[in-house]
């Protein structure tokens, strides 16, 4: 257990062996750590089961800080690389976290902030790169996320009245059945102009939200060429004035069956949501796809759509 803002850790060489399920390598409390400065974890690790690599906690109004930049490979199912509470966690551009194992989480955050400037490649089934509860998450323009089947790039749950933000300015690549950005509750999701969400897998979701009142916005690029995929998806919005807005480009591949097609923008909110394909917005669909599905649809400025 390492406690205090003046703490440091210098681990160079050797090996850590974990034998108990659910163990943590690091327990950090009220710290301010930066890789290569006052935190060095250059050692080997072996484990018989899932574990948490770094568990970091701060306090309300006094968040712990972790700026992590190292190369690590996770070789066990059910593992969390960083678990944080009341903390600001940043993966620097030097960070590279990889795993082919199942149900691996890159960063889990509760009541904090997460920024990814590095690379997360978690290709095992049901893995999540960045997962937060009551947390702001950003994948910056240098951030590169890859997840396998039935996983998520960025997932935010909010059970408070406050608003939390999920922003993607980097690259998110998805396997079949995975979602790029997902928000539940008062979560504002934005795929910015430099954001790129892509998948060749079956049944992928680019952006998805459920509940709350915050708009869902795409200004970047969403390319889903696998069948039965949805570019932007919104549901359970019960307050009027909500918008699902596209000023970017959504591209879909061919669908095998017109009765179960890929959809560019899908809203299940009735008239509570306006679907806006605004100036510069493009929806390009392959054979037997649907560009926009919803009850309150608007095309503004030079917004366009093609689907067949």
Predicted ranges, named:
Residues 110-112, 133-135, 185-187, 211-212, ...:
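Short glycine/proline-enriched coil/turn segments at helix->beta-strand junctions
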Residues 158-160, 184-186, 210-211, 236-238, ...:
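Short aromatic-glycine motifs in intrinsically disordered, low-complexity regions
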Residues 1-22, 32-51, 60-78, 88-103, ...:
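Beta-strand-rich solenoid/repeat architectures in extracellular/passenger domains
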Residues 84:
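Anion-recognition interface
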């Amino acid at each position: 257990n390492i406690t205090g803002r003046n703490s440091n850790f210098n681990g160079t060489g050797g090996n850590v062996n974990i034998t108990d399920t659910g163990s943590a390598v690091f327990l950090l409390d009220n710290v301010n750590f930066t890789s290569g400065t006052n935190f060095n974890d250059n050692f080997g690790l072996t484990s018989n089961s899932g574990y948490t690599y770094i568990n970091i906690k701060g306090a309300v109004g006094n968040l712990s800080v972790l700026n992590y930049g190292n190369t690590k490979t996770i070789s066990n199912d059910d593992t969390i690389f960083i678990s944080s509470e009341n903390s600001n966690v940043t993966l620097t551009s030097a960070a590279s976290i990889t795993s082919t194992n199942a149900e691996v989480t890159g960063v889990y955050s509760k009541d904090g902030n997460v920024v990814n400037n590095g690379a997360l490649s978690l290709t095992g089934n049901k893995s999540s790169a960045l997962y937060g509860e009551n947390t702001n998450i950003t994948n910056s323009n240098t951030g590169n996320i890859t997840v396998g089947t039935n996983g998520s790039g960025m997932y935010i749950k909010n059970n408070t009245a406050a608003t939390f933000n999920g922003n993607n300015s980097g690259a998110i690549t998805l396997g079949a059945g995975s979602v790029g950005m997902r928000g539940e509750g008062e979560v504002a999701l934005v795929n910015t102009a430099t954001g790129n969400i892509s998948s060749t897998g079956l049944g992928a979701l680019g952006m998805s939200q459920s509940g709350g009142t915050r708009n869902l916005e795409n200004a970047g690029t969403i390319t889903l060429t696998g069948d039965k995929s949805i570019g932007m998806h919104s549901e359970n919005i019960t307050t009027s004035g909500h918008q699902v807005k596209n000023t970017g480009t959504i591209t879909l591949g061919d669908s095998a069956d017109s009765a179960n097609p890929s959809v560019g923008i899908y809203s299940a909110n009735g008239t509570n949501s306006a679907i806006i394909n605004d100036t510069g917005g493009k929806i390009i669909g392959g054979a037997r796809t649907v560009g926009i599905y919803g009850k309150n649809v608007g095309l503004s400025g030079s917004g366009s759509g093609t689907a067949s």
